[in-house]
Amino acid sequence: MVESTTLVNQTWWYNPTVDIHPHWAKFDPIPDAVYYSVGIFIGVVGIIGILGNGVVIYLFSKTKSLQTPANMFIINLAMSDLSFSAINGFPLKTISAFMKKWIFGKVACQLYGLLGGIFGFMSINTMAMISIDRYNVIGRPMAASKKMSHRRAFLMIIFVWMWSIVWSVGPVFNWGAYVPEGILTSCSFDYLSTDPSTRSFILCMYFCGFMLPIIIIAFCYFNIVMSVSNHEKEMAAMAKRLNAKELRKAQAGASAEMKLAKISMVIITQFMLSWSPYAIIALLAQFGPAEWVTPYAAELPVLFAKASAIHNPIVYSVSHPKFREAIQTTFPWLLTCCQFDEKECEDANDAEEEVVASERGGESRDAAQMKEMMAMMQKMQAQQAAYQPPPPPQGYPPQGYPPQGAYPPPQGYPPQGYPPQGYPPQGYPPQGAPPQVEAPQGAPPQGVDNQAYQA
């Protein structure tokens, strides 16, 4: 790692209690208005993140219809976002922004960076687990060994915690470092040093902690889209043998599963949009022109990343019918400005047994009907393969049928010499315009009405 500065005099970019990378000394001082704006923004985002994710955890834990294995990932994600808002947002960064420097010392800086890394990796890896669960429910509904249970979800969450800690704890053992960044009011990975140890840490962290979950997410949702296309064809086949009520329930179950998948896709998309600029800055600092990494260019991705913790409660309150119903029951004043779609709620109630059954590890009605349909199709195919048409009765068709020479047409038809040679005669029709025939006497001139002429 590049040695930090040893200047004695304290300036806007140097705090003697922490190690500051000398890269930040190249830029002009940051105006006070920027510090205060960052402090206000982080304070508001932190408070909203704490309250919003607290409501998510409370309602998902309290509401029975939301206590499914898949929603354990949602609770884990909300816990990560709440902790991220409470520790890496408000109040530490807010106070430091108003003080215009990191004031909590070196140990707090390392702890701040460590927890920020753990919670950040935990969020994206939890989203990867959500993608895997959605893929199993929608893309592989009849794979019994892949059904989610509370135990399986708990083990997956434990793995997420361990994986996140592994890729965050390196700087504690001098593999990389945690240092102030941007306008120097928060601490994160040292992405400016280019020594082999730091660069290897940045690359391993980038690919294993960031790119690998993104690849898993992309794979799962690509297969979900393909499965939905096939599912629509299967539903069209099922419509021929189901009555209207059964068909509506099956369609509602599929629609509810797709709604959950769409909510997950929205959450993952906003997370990637929030954290991708930060990843780009880290790679730019390692392999691109370092002078492009200004305090402002480094601070804006930090603000985007820290604001990602407030997106999930907003997405749930807008898109998740069951979550909205739980809010309306427990905190009705939170949705005074919103109205429920009655048809959407009715479809959600019809589909509840479908989604809950599939997520709890049971077999949904939709999956059972699909299995029944496939079994019937296999039975029909087996019957068709085993079917042998009976032999024709003896004496059929009778001998001599069709009569020879009658069908197909007898030889010599049409007769030779037909049409006769020289027909039509040469010079017919004659060349040139047809002869003009004079109008009979008493006829009106060309273009004049006959009745008007006679009158």
Curated annotation (Swiss-Prot):
Q: Member of which family?
A: Belongs to the G-protein coupled receptor 1 family. Opsin subfamily.
Underlying gene = RHO
Instruction: List the keywords (alphabetical).
Output: Cell membrane, Cell projection, Chromophore, Disulfide bond, G-protein coupled receptor, Glycoprotein, Lipoprotein, Membrane, Palmitate, Phosphoprotein, Photoreceptor protein, Receptor, Repeat, Retinal protein, Sensory transduction, Transducer, Transmembrane, Transmembrane helix, Vision
Superkingdom per UniProt: Eukaryota
- Name under which the protein is recorded: Rhodopsin
Does the UniProt entry include the keyword Plastid?
Answer: no
Q: Where is this motif: 'Ionic lock' involved in activated form stabilization?
A: 133-135
User: Residues bearing N6-(retinylidene)lysine?
Assistant: 306
Compartments (UniProt record): Cell projection, Rhabdomere membrane
MF terms per GO, please? G protein-coupled receptor activity; photoreceptor activity; retinal binding
Region annotated Disordered, chain positions: 378-455
Listed Pro residues bias regions: 388-433
Q: Which cysteines are joined by disulfide bonds?
A: 109-187
The way this protein sits in the membrane is described as: Multi-pass membrane protein
Q: Where is this region: 6 X 5 AA repeats of G-Y-P-P-Q?
A: 395-431
SMART domains referenced in this protein's UniProt entry, alphabetically: 7TM_GPCR_Srsx (SM01381)
Instruction: List the S-palmitoyl cysteine lipid attachment residues.
Output: 337-338
Q: In this UniProt entry, which residues form the Extracellular topological domain(s)?
A: 1-34, 99-110, 174-200, 285-294
Alphabetized SUPFAM superfamilies for the sequence = Family A G protein-coupled receptor-like
Question: Which Pfam families has this protein been placed in?
Answer: 7tm_1, XYPPX
Which stretches are tagged as biased composition: Low complexity?
A: 378-387
Name its GO BP terms in alphabetical order. phototransduction; visual perception
Per the record, ranges on the Cytoplasmic side are: 60-71, 133-152, 226-262, 317-455
Q: Where are the sequence repeats?
A: 395-399, 400-404, 412-416, 417-421, 422-426, 427-431
